[in-house]
């Protein structure tokens, strides 16, 4: 039986991409999926790439999702903070930035001991007064930070368009 031996000094066509470390395929900061713990026939292929996170199973919802919305009458930020109690969260306004900070010390869960900390910053839109920003925490662990948008001053009016007979662009004189 013949055994193929690959010498390290021989470069193959896709050399950096055959590496078992899969550096380009790592999703840094994301939790592991169950499928990541088991090798499959496709993951053993040197050309296999893990699908992008937006195409994977909806377990990404469980990762501290943040959403910022600009509606007609208000600005809002929704942030999943279900692993934190209200005492472990701080919301501050510094100039035109909202800072959300959450931290809990090491504690035991079903897998062992864990501690968590995060910092998020959101720019406050120009038409939102920083003094009117409020925050609330829902029973399912979603922190909502919002503020009303300033209404345009004065009533809306339509401006008529007049037609002029002379051109706006005139040709430059020839030399």
From Swiss-Prot:
The protein's name in its UniProt record: Alpha-crystallin B chain
Q: Which organism is it from?
A: Rattus norvegicus (Rat)
* Hydrolase in keyword set: no
Record bears the keyword Glycoprotein: yes
Q: How does it assemble?
A: Heteromer composed of three CRYAA and one CRYAB subunits. Aggregates with homologous proteins, including the small heat shock protein HSPB1, to form large heteromeric complexes. Inter-subunit bridging via zinc ions enhances stability, which is crucial as there is no protein turn over in the lens. Interacts with HSPBAP1. Interacts with TTN/titin. Interacts with TMEM109; in the cellular response to DNA damage. Interacts with DES; binds rapidly during early stages of DES filament assembly and a reduced binding seen in the later stages.
Tell me where in this chain the PTM Phosphoserine is found. 19, 45, 59
> Where are residues bearing N-acetylmethionine located in the sequence?
1
Binding positions (Zn(2+) 2): 104, 106
Instruction: Read off the SUPFAM superfamilies from this record.
Output: HSP20-like chaperones
The Gene Ontology CC terms held by the record are:
actin filament bundle; axon; cardiac myofibril; cell surface; contractile muscle fiber; cytoplasm; cytosol; dendritic spine
Gene label: Cryab
């Amino acid at each position: 039986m013949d055994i193929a031996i690959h010498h390290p000094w021989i470069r193959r066509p896709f050399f950096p991409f055959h590496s078992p470390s899969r550096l380009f395929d790592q999703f840094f900061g994301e939790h592991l999926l169950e499928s990541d713990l088991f090798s499959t026939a496709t993951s053993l292929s040197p050309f296999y790439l893990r699908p992008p996170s937006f195409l994977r199973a909806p377990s990404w919802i469980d990762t501290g999702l943040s959403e910022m919305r600009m509606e007609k009458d208000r600005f809002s930020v929704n942030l999943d903070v279900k692993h934190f109690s209200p005492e472990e969260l701080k919301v501050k306004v510094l100039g035109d930035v909202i800072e959300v900070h959450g931290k809990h010390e090491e504690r035991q869960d079903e897998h062992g001991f864990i501690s968590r900390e995060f910092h998020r910053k959101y720019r406050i839109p120009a038409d939102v007064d920083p003094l009117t920003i409020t925050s609330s925490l829902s029973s399912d662990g979603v922190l909502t930070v919002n503020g009303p948008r300033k209404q345009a001053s004065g009533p809306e009016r339509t401006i008529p368009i007049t037609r002029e007979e002379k051109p706006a662009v005139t040709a430059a004189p020839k030399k």
